[in-house]
Amino acid sequence: MICNQCPRRCNAIREANIAEGFCGMPSEPVVARADLHLWEEPCISGSSGSGTIFFSGCVLKCVFCQNSVISTERFGKKISINRLAQIMKELEDKGAHNINFVTPTHYVHAIKDALKIYTPKIPLVYNCGGYEDLDLIKEDVFDIYLFDLKYLSSETSLKYSL
């Protein structure tokens, strides 16, 4: 695929074994962790946890990243679209209050394909760094958008995120 999913619009080739884009990730999802997560904002975690899927890679590369192993070092396991759909169902079956996609920007295509296979009955959370394509948000795929507010100026963002 020629990738233009994030605002960088890098036109990179992203295939199963090719990852030329800014995010450095292949087209197939790479997941660092998927499980119930009790440490999000209380309204997201609830009493049973948020069904969190941590994707590897990132479109920001902030110098202060708390998840740099996940965001820049490709830590995680490559999974199929079918497996992503299964993970959503498994998390829902475990009692998750929602399905929480963390750093999903560069894998929105995979999430949409997985949702065609299985659509959870619980809310879908788009948990991101805040550098997003407005057209994606207008598509109304996700129920909750959890954005990080990192910077108030372009100058600061250029200094601390690549």
What are these regions (language model features)?
Residues 1-20, 25:
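Auxiliary Fe-S-binding modules of radical SAM enzymes
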Residues 156-162:
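Anionic-ligand binding region
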Residues 19, 23-145, 153-155:
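Conserved Radical SAM active-site core
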